[in-house]
Amino acid sequence: VTMVTLGLDTSNYTTSAAVFDGADGVNAGRLLEVRPGQLGLRQSEALFQHVKALPGRMAELAESGVLRDVAAVAASARPRAVEGSYMPCFLAGESQGRALAAALGVPFFAVSHQQGHLAAAAWSAGRMELLDAPFLAWHLSGGTTELLYVQPEGANVKAGRIGGTADISAGQLIDRTGVLLGLDFPAGRALDALAAGAEKGPKRFKVKMDGLEFSLSGMENQVRALAAGGVEPAAVARFALDTVSDVVRRTTEEARKRYPGLPVLCSGGVASNSGLRQMLTASCGALFAEPRYSTDNAMGVAILAHRLLERGE
């Protein structure tokens, strides 16, 4: 009998449920509804939408015929596996996960949203073995721009932040640039498409770095100034994306001097940006999660459930 595990992830942006059988998996996800012009949701509203959306995600999995012989359930219970990391929206997935596990008489595992991202990224990059030795990982998303040092911890992973932004995240810069240019939130994909139409953006802004830390708020002011100065939207988009790619590349190169020989794995919505991928692949052979497993998903959570169950943890 194939051992199937179920993962649930109820983040700030997406309601997801996924199953994994040890090799392959299916993820059913749906973005939360954000009103046009708004930058995200309050926690109470996100939690309410998740509670309403989860049965639909489960039904999707059931209809595709993959939801049987579930041997364990896992859910993202918090953003990161560190003391004091908490967000009410994860309660939706965790409580339904615990209830399902109890009803099925199978183990329940609580993992972090970040651990799920790392597992999904490694699996979708075709490099699941990364999870069994130290590596460097960029998490580039709407809420975080972090460079992590990741090492195995039993069947799961332990991630420590070694660099990234001191203020707004790359995703926030991209979303704010997009909304400023009249695009919908979240704006990553649309901004990427818009930037592709630019002959050439204004000369990229060289973001100051302090070791492996950098700040993007000054960059946001530059974007506002360009847009207000009548620079065409495609060029502004290109400028924002090129600048982000450049500082991520420089930080990665600096990190590789400090941690020689470690592979670099990139995930998070911003990691699906085409320019960034080209730049990092060329500069350090970085590995990338598949775009659909780069954004929030429950796949990594289901993968971790499988690993934890298999190794009897």
What are these regions, as identified by a protein language model?
Residues 10-48, 156-161:
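Short glycine-rich, Thr/Ser-proximal phosphate-binding strand/loop in the N-terminal lobe
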Residues 10-11, 27, 129-133, 139-141, ...:
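A short helix-loop
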Residues 31, 49-64, 247-252:
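Short, well-ordered amphipathic alpha-helical segments that serve as non-catalytic structural scaffolds
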Residues 59-98, 102:
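Short beta-strand-loop/turn "lid" adjacent to the catalytic site in phosphate-handling enzymes
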Residues 75-78, 141, 265-273:
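Glycine-rich beta-strand-to-loop/alpha-helix junction loops that act as flexible
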Residues 106-136, 304:
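Conserved phosphate-binding catalytic cores of ATP/NTP-utilizing and phosphoryl-transfer enzymes
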Residues 117-121, 290-313:
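Glycine-rich phosphate-binding/hydrolytic loop that grips phosphoryl groups
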Residues 193-264, 270-281, 285-287, 306-312:
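A contiguous, well-structured pocket-lining segment that forms one wall/lid of small-molecule binding clefts
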